[in-house]
């Protein structure tokens, strides 16, 4: 149900008006104050339970100076832009419109079946007297946080304009503890650093680790979503929502005054955005609570996005899948078919005359082996990477015509393999690695999607490894952000679901476009084969990267010493086996991969049972215990079955947690199966040590579970039946 009441205080001609406005959250705990500071500078503050969260912070944008106007048919003389134009001062207060809304909506898939969208809104219209330009700042205050954006109505004095920089500030109250990755225009694939804000400059050089494409921009620049904790126990998260036709926002820190200022990703010419009024920016968001669990449970980002754009969503389904992938990531096999050709020319290189290397992973026999295992254990799909021609010189050459997305290698029979998979009751998942040659992908996109239609594919994993073509563009600039959505929308025309890797980090657009069922956009499991990730990584990601949407983290590695897969790779997966099981619950995604090799799962089939059983779509989710960088424990109720699944992970420290079961129905008995670290488990020395126990639990049960260093646990819970009468209580 939605109720909106509109109150407008218009500035009458010649009348005086206060330059300060207040907005409260529906529960009254959050308080926003907007004012015009000296010089007509828009400013805001935010308090939580009468404790300051954001100190007075500036707002607005700087525009590129106007260039001489060109007229069609006139002599063309290209002039340089004039001086930058301010849209951050010189304002007077105009109309203030207030409203409130309280409604619920049902996501196509998600952490819960229904989401409440309740907020109070204030839209402040500002007039810049010297230019006659109007700008509206729209604030929405929820019980869990704040969203605001800049809106530019249609007006003669501001129609086409170019953004030089956004001037939004977030002034912190002190030297907070932050969980951050370096600000970068091209990658989020960094390990997180936990430090005080004042230490970011000192720690930045060590935090910037090599990547296939990276452009750090500042010694104190960080990426959103940024999670912080104040000394007085407030958890503060800064991000953005509904990133459409705009550049990704980073944060640049003034580390003397602890003030963050927005920093937009530039284009090849250094400009930040090309706009045409009427238009608006994405929402800037601040989520805040004195309980870390509230940050994880917040739906602020989703609520600030537009409703679903599709009338029919029946074709969009959660997916549990395996892949011909980990063996390539670890170096056991190759994406490429041959080593005989130093360079590939599509349509010219004759692969029938090339000698196979013998290391090509996507061959008919190997793919069938994966299909057999995946089908036997109830998986929906099998990803196959390296199926298409062009991998011999795909990376590092800024090559435009690199893949055509329709031509298979000689040893990949696309028709026969899809028929074989369908006969076993599963589908193949398409792979479109673009090598960041985006123009090439767009010119082939329609043909690529039609090929998927022809052979029965309904999901695609896309990738953007390397520096972007066109040259000079960045992964997170306005042009690329428009491309990512273009790919998702065109996929929807073919009823195809998209899992985008190396794309911009999510901002809740999966609400509007639910066929965007997965993103990577962070350091995923593949880095465990590239030297490893820190154990605390998975206790931070739900507070940061997952704030904007689910992640295709690709968990489920059971053999931690990578040398057992490829003797030449001495990486180690920094997790216990029980930790890997827990990730299917703690790292929410409607797209979940069992990433390891079939032969590894066959060694631990009792533990693999949890991956078979765990659900993908949820009726409700409860965050039971949480502290960023330390631990997370989550309970989720499966949609349609009433079964519960619980997952817990810890950092590099061993810890014991006491689990409540008060979310279970009163008066009922349940059977719980616990997959836990063995007493001698350790992520470095004994990662495969686990125990499995089954027993009865109820609403009043409390259970102590010990997690090893880098460890965790997983629990499946179902209602008890008469056959379970002899089971003892779980201990």
Task: Please describe what each predicted stretch is.
Residues 124, 596-645, 649, 680-686:
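Glycan-recognition and catalytic regions of carbohydrate-active enzymes
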Residues 22-312, 689:
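N-terminal accessory beta-strand-rich subdomains and adjacent acidic, glycine-rich linkers
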Residues 694-731:
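C-terminal beta-strand-rich structural cap/linker in extracellular carbohydrate-active enzymes
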Residues 272, 276-369, 373, 377, ...:
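An acidic-aromatic substrate-binding cleft motif
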Residues 628-671, 713-716:
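Carbohydrate-binding surface patches
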Residues 150, 374, 498, 586, ...:
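Conserved, mostly hydrophobic/aromatic
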Residues 1-21:
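Bacterial Sec-dependent N-terminal signal peptides
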Residues 385-572, 576:
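Aromatic- and carboxylate-enriched substrate-binding clefts and catalytic-loop regions
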């Amino acid at each position: 149900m939605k109720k909106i009441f509109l109150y407008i205080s218009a500035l009458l001609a010649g009348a005086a008006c206060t330059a300060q406005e207040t907005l409260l959250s529906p529960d009254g705990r959050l308080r926003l104050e907007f004012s015009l500071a000296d010089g007509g500078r828009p400013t805001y503050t935010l308090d939580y339970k009468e404790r300051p969260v954001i100190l007075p912070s500036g707002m607005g944008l700087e525009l590129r100076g106007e260039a001489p106007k060109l007229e069609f048919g006139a002599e063309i003389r290209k002039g340089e832009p004039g001086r930058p134009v301010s849209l951050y001062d010189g304002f007077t207060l105009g109309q203030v419109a207030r409203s409130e809304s309280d409604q619920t909506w049902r996501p196509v898939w998600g952490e819960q079946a229904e989401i409440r969208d309740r907020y109070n809104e204030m839209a402040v219209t500002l007039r810049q007297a010297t230019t006659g330009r109007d700008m509206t700042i729209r604030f929405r205050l929820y019980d869990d946080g704040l969203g605001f954006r800049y809106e530019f109505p249609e007006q003669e004095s501001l129609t086409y304009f170019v953004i030089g920089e956004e001037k939004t500030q977030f002034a912190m109250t002190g030297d907070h503890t932050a969980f951050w990755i370096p600000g970068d225009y091209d990658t989020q694939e960094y390990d997180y650093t936990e430090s005080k804000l004042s230490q970011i400059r000192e720690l930045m050089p060590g935090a910037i680790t090599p990547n296939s494409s990276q452009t750090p921009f500042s010694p104190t620049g960080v990426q959103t979503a940024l999670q912080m904790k104040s000394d007085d126990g407030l958890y503060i998260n800064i991000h953005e929502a509904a990133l459409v036709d705009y550049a990704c926002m980073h944060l640049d820190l003034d580390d003397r005054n602890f003030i963050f200022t927005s920093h937009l990703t530039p284009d090849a010419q250094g400009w930040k955005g090309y706009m045409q009024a009427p238009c608006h920016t994405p929402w800037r968001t601040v989520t805040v609570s004195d309980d870390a669990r509230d940050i994880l449970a917040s739906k602020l980002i989703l609520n600030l996005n537009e409703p679903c754009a599709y009338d029919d969503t029946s074709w969009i389904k959660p997916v549990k899948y395996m892949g011909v992938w980990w063996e390539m990531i670890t170096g056991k096999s190759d994406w490429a078919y041959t080593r005989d050709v130093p360079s590939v020319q599509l349509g010219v290189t004759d692969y029938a005359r090339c000698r196979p290397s013998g290391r090509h992973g996507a061959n008919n026999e190997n793919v069938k082996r994966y299909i057999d295992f995946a089908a036997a254990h109830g998986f929906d799909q099998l990803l196959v990477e390296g199926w298409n021609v062009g991998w011999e010189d795909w990376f590092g050459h800024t090559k435009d015509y690199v893949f055509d997305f329709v031509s298979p290698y000689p040893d990949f029979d696309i028709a026969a393999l899809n028929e074989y998979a369908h006969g076993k009751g599963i589908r193949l998942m398409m792979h479109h690695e673009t090598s960041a040659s985006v123009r090439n992908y767009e010119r082939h996109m329609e043909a690529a999607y039609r090929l998927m239609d022809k052979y029965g594919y309904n999901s695609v994993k896309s990738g953007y490894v390397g520096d972007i073509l066109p040259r000079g563009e960045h992964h997170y600039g306005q042009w690329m952000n428009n491309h990512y959505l273009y790919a998702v929308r065109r996929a929807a025309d073919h009823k195809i679901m998209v899992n985008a890797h190396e794309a911009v980090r999510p901002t809740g657009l999966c609400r509007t476009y639910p066929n965007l069922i997965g993103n990577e956009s962070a350091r995923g499991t593949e880095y465990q084969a590239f030297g490893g990730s820190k154990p605390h990584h998975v206790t931070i990601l739900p507070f940061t990267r997952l704030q904007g949407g689910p992640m295709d983290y690709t968990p489920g590695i059971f053999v931690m010493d990578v040398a057992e897969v490829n003797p030449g790779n001495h990486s180690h997966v920094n997790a216990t086996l029980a930790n890997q099981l827990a990730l299917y619950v703690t790292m929410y995604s409607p797209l979940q991969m069992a990433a390891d090799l079939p032969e590894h799962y066959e060694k631990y089939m009792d533990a693999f049972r949890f991956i078979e059983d765990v659900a993908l779509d949820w009726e409700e989710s409860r965050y039971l215990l949480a502290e960023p960088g330390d631990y997370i424990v989550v309970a989720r109720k499966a949609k349609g079955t009433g079964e519960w699944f619980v997952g817990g992970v810890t950092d590099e420290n061993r810890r014991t947690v006491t689990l409540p079961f008060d979310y279970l129905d009163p008066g009922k008995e349940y059977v719980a199966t616990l997959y836990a670290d063995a007493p001698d488990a350790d992520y470095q020395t004994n990662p495969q040590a686990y125990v499995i126990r089954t027993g009865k639990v109820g609403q009043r049960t409390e259970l102590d579970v010990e997690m090893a260093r880098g460890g965790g646990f997983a629990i499946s819970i179902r209602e008890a039946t008469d056959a379970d009468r002899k089971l003892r209580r779980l201990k």
